[in-house]
Amino acid sequence: MITVDRDGKRFGNEALSYHDFGRQMLDHHATEQEVYAWIIGDKRLMDKYGIGYAKPWPVPRGFFHRIGFLHMGRSIADLAQNSGVDPQGLERTIERFNRDALAGKDGEFGRGSTAYNHFRGDMEHTPNPNLAPLAKGPFNAAKEQMGDIG
């Protein structure tokens, strides 16, 4: 899973707390009218974890596609087009992220480099429990907006 802006670029460590990641999101979008990002996942992620309200397999996800909560694409380019994200930016971001995930080190934002990150990871995944390539479609995206978590 990665989170990207409308240009298809990551802007922070997605394994941080909601508060810290929210701060990164606000800082990154400081000059923009609307603060939002896209959570991107592949088939493996959707089947094992889901995204937000869209729960993992075997829970059907058609409803979430119909109401616009989830956007789907058979390829990264399709997903970008269906969600309004820059296709070239998203392709480049996922290529870099996948290389880093296979190597087990997030060269951009250090995801998986702290005990807190590891606690929020999947210990069955190695070499870094916080990094897995986004490799197999269909790919899904959900719009993420700032909110109050209590």
Predicted feature residues:
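A glycine-rich dinucleotide-binding beta-alpha-beta segment and adjacent secondary-structure elements
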Residues: 89-150
